[in-house]
Amino acid sequence: MMKQLLNSLCMTIALLTVWTGAKAASVPTVTWDSQSLLIDGHRVCPVMGEIHYSRIPADEWACEVKKMKEGGVTIIATYVFWNHIEEQEGIFRWDGQRSLRRFLEVCQQEQMPVVLRLGPFCHGEVRNGGIPDWVFTKGCKLRESNPVFLGLAEKLYRQIFTQVQGLQWKDGGPVIAAQFDNEYRGRGEYLVALKRIAEKIGFDLPFYTRTGWPELRTPVPFGEMLPLYGDYADGFWDKEITEGCGSYYKAFNFSTPSHSAGGGENMGALDGANDNKKAAESPSPSGWSGGAYPYFTCELGGGMATAYHRRPLLQPEDAYSMALVKLGSGSNLLGYYMYHGGTNPEGVLHTMNECQTSPGTANNDLPVMTYDFQAPLGEFGQTYPHYYTLRPLHLFMHDWGETLAPMRASFPSPQELKQGDDQQLRWAVRSINGKQGNETSSSGTAEGSAFIFVNNYERFFKLSKKANVQLEACGIKLPKLSIPSGCMAIFPVNIDGIRYATAQLVARREGKTYLM
């Protein structure tokens, strides 16, 4: 039955009805507002999975993109690493596994939208974060709005655009959005300058993004680019080597984004909250219908890399728990970093791994070749257990995304917990404004409808079974439950004629609703 559902998923994903193999007769309109993305006015809850095309042999792209699609991924994200394509100044390589255009054509064939993370700085555990060594000899400050560095960035973007031209969303192509730089903490004007360069060259996409962490020194004007967030179950970059160090445990508790773990950085909405505070005072940009930015992620840890000094071993439950918690906390786009591992390409002058002997991003020593990341799909496309455990969640997001997207999160249990806190069950509710009754929202969702999210899991801690738990949403009390240790679930309330269920919705096909 699950195989039938997955086959059906691949045929019906709303985001993927754009292409017929050639330019689409009518390209769907993509907009955003304070809640979600909208495709032709319909709310969607996409699943974005990161794969680095230049870390995978070109002949394997089609097979691996299909696997991602079958896992429920509806948007591909990929970095364009500058030093993978211009390791030597002026010599651009778009051959073999570096051929961005060929990769985009594969995604178009598989009807998978693509978010390009353009750099110039990417990180991705690549040497110098992707910036070629020769750039460090130019005598300019990197990642700032000075003419020299912006001139280099423009040359890079022009080269990338030669690969993208004709494959943008407006052309019926797969490229739906672009991210500028990565994990930037400087002045917002630099990110805006990168966007203006891209627009001048010819980039014309439905939306643009940036990482919402760390906090910028000066803001980006509201509406220019969506801030996207993240969380990780563990991090190779920590200086300590003890298990459970840092604030990663926060990723396993329902909370507003400002309570996010961030792996040493606040990857929640610290910066986004500042943006949203300015929203009411800002002119409404095209595609924005008021309030604030939507809560999206681009770096929800699908696994974790290992460094020489710190080698976290993740469990399949880690990724599933974080994903469910983020969804229950109000996120309407789950973006995994990574969803598919890979292998560093060979360089001409240097190895391409992050290492302490490089002129930039030199805090950690990463493996020379492997970038498996313990992702749902590993370095060679092998499936790890969480590839399968995440699929039902992705099916749910696809089939009930339009119902879920306008629902706000509320938190009956405390948002601030200490590591290993086991005093009470962790749960959250998503409903329309948290109100009871039979009113409907503008999208037609009944205000008496809700989803109850439950997470009784935390990495490194065996949380106890919770007995006689009384869950309630929209005035409807569920029977008292016993929640086993490690249990993670989503219970519907007043959804599709179901008053409530102590089982999780998976999919609906041909008038039938499937639960597990």
Go through each PLM region and give its residues.
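A cross-family glycoside hydrolase active-site/sugar-binding cleft signature
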Residues: V47-H52, A77-Y79, V115-G119, Q179-D181, ...
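Acidic-and-aromatic substrate-binding clefts and catalytic sites of carbohydrate-active enzymes
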Residues: Y53-D59, I85-E86, G90-D95, Y184-G188, ...
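Aromatic-lined substrate-binding rim segments of carbohydrate-active enzymes
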Residues: W61-R127, E199
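Active-site region of glycoside hydrolase catalytic domains
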Residues: Q109-V115, C122-G272, E281-T306, G328-S331
